[in-house]
Amino acid sequence: MCFTNKGRAFVTVVYDLPTSENRTAKGLPVQNFFNIDKDNGEVITALLPIAEFNAEEYFLMATKKGLVKKTSLSAYVSFVKRMNSSSITAVNLQEDDELIGVEISSGDDDVFLFADNGYAQHFCEYYKKKVTDDSETDDATDNNEESSDEEGSIDRHAGSGVRPSSRSSGCIRGIKLRGDAHVVSLMVVAPSQIEKGQCLIASANGFGKRLALADIPMRNRGGQGVIVMKNLERNGAVIGAVIGEENADYMLITNQGQLIRSSMSETHLISRYSAGNILMRMNEGDAVQALQSIPEDVVKSSKEVAEARQKEKEELAALEAAQKAKDAEAEAIKAYAAPQRGESVETVENTTENTDNQ
């Protein structure tokens, strides 16, 4: 399924997408598969492969203004059965708001929202059904539950997370943003992954840091969050955050088209109070536009392919070297045999050639 910044959802089957073994292949325009309104600034913000539309799993969505919403995957079954290029509304957005991310959740996962002002909000999505939940009041203005940003223990199953709602409903507040700040990244993490989990945060001026997820304290939904990136005067605004597996890679892409790929392990794991380190040196007037993670299994597969190709090259080089050595040995034998018989090397070669022809 494909989600756009305008809150629309599209669906297609994977076997309809073009395949290529060439990493430099351009592929086909996304408009060939989905009716994206490019002229109106519509872009894809999430692309999720789904095998089954399980009623116990959810699409958890986040918007630029810090609002969140979750809807059961089963609510999209009828839409998927139609399987055409038309779209449906996945979320009703407020004016000037955009959908920035969609993830699949279990209903009891941890949610992280990262804002461009260096703040991050961590809360549990678990929601305990109440008697009044039969009415559809999913607009953010009707759900301004404020949370405390004070340090302290939070019960993840207190039930004040994100209530499942219908496709036609609005959103509720996930993080209370300061000034003109906006959310740039959404992460959904299983509780079992929090203790050892890490994330990578990047800023517009090429700085970043790797941070333990456990260092971002859990709060109730709707709070202002905590600082995860300081010194924005030097670093620039936060442009994104991704899961930072130890053996994974990441890519940074700039406005001027520069791209680097590096290993997560090469970025120091530091505290959330630290300002961060240089990830990429920028040209004057350039800025980091996007951060993309490359999962550990993809990195491993890429390394295996690269190693296999290198082995093939080495084996081919060894065969060529062996053939050259064999040819050189044959030439040496001819050169040695000619004087012994009182013949020139050319005569020996001609005699050998005539013998071969006969």
Located regions from the model:
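Short, structured "edge-of-domain" segments at secondary-structure transitions
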Residues: 1-358
